[in-house]
Amino acid sequence: MSEQKAFSLNVDEQNIAWLAIDVPNEKMNTLQAAFADEMKEIFAQLKDSSGIKGMIIHSLKPDNFVAGADVRMLEACTTANEAQALAKQGQELFQQLSDLPYPVVAAIHGPCLGGGLELALACDYRVCTDFDKTRLGLPEVQLGLLPGSGGTQRLPRLIGLLPSLDLILTGKQLRAKKAKKLGVVDACVPDTILLDVAKQFIDKGKNKGKKKQSTKEKLMSGSGLGRKLVFEQAAKKTNQKTRGNYPATVAILEVIQHGLEKGFAQGQELEAKRFGELVMSSESKALRSIFFATTEMKKEHGTDAQPAAVKKVGVLGGGLMGAGISHVTVAKAKVPVRIKDVSNDGVLNALNYNYKLFEKQRKRRILSKADLQAKMLQLSGGVDFTSYNHIDVVIEAVFEDLDLKQQMVADIEANAKSETIFATNTSSLPIHKIAEKAERPENIVGLHYFSPVEKMPLVEVIPHETTSDETISTVVALAKKQGKTPIVVKDKAGFYVNRILAPYMNEAAHILLANEPIEKLDGALLDFGFPVGPITLLDEVGVDIGAKIMPILVNELGERFKGPDVFDILLNDGRKGRKSGKGFYTYKGKKKEVDKSIYKLLKLTPESKLSDNDIALRCVLPMLNEAVRCLDDGIIRSPRDGDIGAIFGIGFPPFLGGPFRYMDQFGLKELVEKMNEFASKYGDRYAPCDGLLTRAGEGRTFY
C-alpha cells in the first residue's frame, strides 16, 4: 500500500494543473519540513509537463486551507542555524512556486495563516471564500517569531508598508472581505464558485499589475525619508506596547526595512537569520509552550465522562457578569439563553448589553442586520422561571451572598429538570457550602468567569467533593464552546487565580504604604510584562470587591493573606475604583490620572526609593510562592494549568510562560535565595514554602 501524501498533482483536459493539499491523519493542513521532498517531486513533475496553462492550489479539507507551519518541528531545533535552515527551505520552495512560468492561483477556503499565507503570497493571485471561518494572517509574532518563509518581504510589496506593518506586528487575522479590501486577496466569493473563479484568474496571465497605492502610502513609504519616519513611528508605538519584552517585534521592523532598502533577496536572507535566532529565544519558547498547552487542553474534558448535550442555558442575574455570560453563550457557543432576574430592568439591562456588543460587530460588518436580529432572538428573559423545565445548564451570577445562592439552588431544583446542572459563578464562596442544602449536590459545580466575560479567556471549573464527573465534563465542554480555556481547580478559598493574586496585591499595598509613588509602582509591573499595574488592577476590579475577598482568604487560609488595612479608609471616602469615578486614580471618560489627594488620605509622602526591578520582584515573588502551595495542595492539577490560569486569568507575562515556567527559568535555588533575602528585609511573608525548598534542595524543576 502506497504511503499517503500531503500534496497531489493532477492536470485537467484544459491543461490547468491542480495542486491539492490534504495532510494525512490531520484535521487541519499544516506545513511540515518533511513535505519538502514531496514539493520537490511536484516541481519535477511540473517541469516535465508541457503546455501547462496555469496552476490552482487548493485544499481537500472541508473547512481549512493551510493553518500554518507545524510549530512542533521547531522543538526539534537545537541551534539557531537549524531553525534558520528550516526558514531557508521554505523560502526556496515558495520562490520556485513564484518563478513558475505560468500563473498560479491560491483558492482559499477556511484559515490561511502563517506559512499558509506565505504560500498564498508566493502565488500570482489569491481568491478566497466569504465563509465565516476564512481568516488570513501572519500570527507568528504571537509565538515570539516572525514570518520566516518570505512573508516579511512579499506582504509589504503586495499591499504596501503601512498595512503590512500593522498585520505582521500584531499578528491579527483578517476576515475575507477585509482581506479583499486591503488587497491581500484578489477576489472574495461564495465557496460554491471558488474554483471556477480561480480558473478565471488563470486567463489573466502571469504578470499582474501592481496594486494601486493610497496617497498616504505613497507619501509615507514611497521615499527613503518617508519610510524612515514610518519605521521610527512604528518602533516607538510598538515599544510603548511591548516595553521591550518582545524581541520579535524589533526583528520584524528590522527585516522589513532591510528588504525594502537592500532588495528582496537580502531581505529574505536576514528574515531567515532572525527567524533562527528567535526560535531559540526564551520568549518564543515560553510563548510556544502556551500554544502547546492550550492545544492540549482543547482535547480534554476535565474527567473521563462524556459531556451531556447542552441545548439551552439559563442565566440567573442580569448584571454585568450575567450579561457577559449570556453573550458568550449565544455568540460563541450558539446556544439559546433564558435570563432570570428579580426585576424586568435587570433583564432589559442584560439584553441591552448584548445588543450593544452585537451592534458593534454589525458596524464592523462582522454581522449583518439579519444576523444581529437572529442572535437577539436567541436571548429571552423574565422575572420568573418560565421555560426553566427545558434548560440543561443554569449559570448563576447573582450577588455574593451564601443564603441567596442556596436559595437559587432550591429554586432551580424546584423549577428545572432533575438532571439540570447548576453552575455558580462565585469568586469567593466555597462551592460545597452553596451545595450544602441541595437535593442533588452532584449537579452543582463552580464556574468562575472573569470580568469582562466577553474578553477574558479563562474560566475556573470548581467541583466540590460530590460533583459528578458528567457535570464536570459538561461544563468544561460548554466553557470551551463559549470560547474559554477552562482549568479544573479544587474547592478551596480563592480557588487558584484569586489565591495567587491576593499576595501580589497585598505586596503592592505594602510598597505603596512605604511611600513609593503610585505611577512608579504600576509602571514597574508594566515593564515586567503585566498588562496593567496592581494599583490600576485594584481600581478596575473594585476596591469593594477586594475588601470582600481578602477577609475570606485570611479566615480560610491564615494570616499570610492579611494585607495592610487600606480598604475601609478608601471605601469610607467613596473610593470604589473606576466604577465610582475614583479610587487611587480619578476617571473622566477614558482618561485616568493619579488622584494626588490619596496620599494625604493615607498619610503618605510619595518618594521613589526602590528600583523598578525590586518593586516587580517584591510583588511577584509572593505570587510564585502561593502558586507552588496551590500545586502542592492539589488546587491545580499541574504546573501547566497553573501557568495557563495565571496568564489568562490575571495577565501574568506570556513571554515568561507563566509562574512555573518562569521559576524554572529563574532557577529554584536562586529563587529561594532571593526570597530569603527579601524575608530578612521585609518580613516572613517572603519565606519560601516547603515545596520550593524541597525542589530547590533536590535540584528539581516543574517541567
UniProtKB/Swiss-Prot annotation:
Residue numbers spanned by region Enoyl-CoA hydratase: 1-190
GO cellular component, one term: cytoplasm
Region (3-hydroxyacyl-CoA dehydrogenase): 308-703
Pathway of action: Lipid metabolism; fatty acid beta-oxidation
Keywords of this entry: Cytoplasm, Fatty acid metabolism, Isomerase, Lipid degradation, Lipid metabolism, Lyase, Multifunctional enzyme, NAD, Oxidoreductase
EC numbers, comma separated: 4.2.1.17, 5.1.2.3, 1.1.1.35
InterPro entries reported in the protein's UniProt record: 3-OHacyl-CoA_DH_CS, 3-OHacyl-CoA_DH_NAD-bd, 3HC_DH_C, 6-PGluconate_DH-like_C_sf, ClpP/crotonase-like_dom_sf, Enoyl-CoA_hyd/isom_CS, Enoyl-CoA_hydra/iso, FA_oxidation_alpha_subunit
Alphabetized GO MF terms: 3-hydroxybutyryl-CoA epimerase activity; enoyl-CoA hydratase activity; long-chain-3-hydroxyacyl-CoA dehydrogenase activity; NAD+ binding
Chain positions of site Important for catalytic activity: 118, 140
Location of the protein in the cell: Cytoplasm
UniProt cross-references to SUPFAM superfamilies, sorted A to Z: 6-phosphogluconate dehydrogenase C-terminal domain-like, ClpP/crotonase, NAD(P)-binding Rossmann-fold domains
Catalysed transformations (reactions): a (3S)-3-hydroxyacyl-CoA = a (2E)-enoyl-CoA + H2O; a 4-saturated-(3S)-3-hydroxyacyl-CoA = a (3E)-enoyl-CoA + H2O; a (3S)-3-hydroxyacyl-CoA + NAD(+) = a 3-oxoacyl-CoA + NADH + H(+); (3S)-3-hydroxybutanoyl-CoA = (3R)-3-hydroxybutanoyl-CoA
Alphabetized NCBIfam families for the sequence: FadJ, PRK11154.1
Subunit structure: Heterotetramer of two alpha chains (FadJ) and two beta chains (FadI).
PANTHER family tied to this protein: TRIFUNCTIONAL ENZYME SUBUNIT ALPHA, TRIFUNCTIONAL ENZYME SUBUNIT ALPHA, MITOCHONDRIAL
Family indicated by similarity: In the N-terminal section; belongs to the enoyl-CoA hydratase/isomerase family. In the central section; belongs to the 3-hydroxyacyl-CoA dehydrogenase family.
Protein name: Fatty acid oxidation complex subunit alpha
Gene: fadJ
